[in-house]
Amino acid sequence: MSNANEKQVGGNHYKVSGGRQHWDLIDDFNVGYLEGCFTKYVTRWMSKDGLKDLRKAEHFAQKLYEKRSAMNSVERCPNVPTFEIFQYASANRLGPAEFQLVEKMLTWKQPSDLLEVLRLLA
């Protein structure tokens, strides 16, 4: 049986040599769907659909902000350790701006923190 990480369907935008793939990071830390989709689009934007992917990321951040604000939620992202995010960003060749976006999305504590993510994308 082959390893799912060795198989890439539809391009190489997630294929990482020796590093952690996006789905591994999300699954390992039980990251929510909206945060996961956001980080997926930020990770791949330069190698797949460009600005369209950044707009998709923005859309997911907006939805997350709206849902959490409406709920007066104290729920937060599972707080992925910065070291893990750094390793992921390095393996996936993310630049400083992409690293900052992914880090903020994976460590937010209150809905107002998501506004900073949206400001960075504007």
PLM features: residue spans?
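Intrinsically disordered, low-complexity regulatory regions
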Residues: 1-122
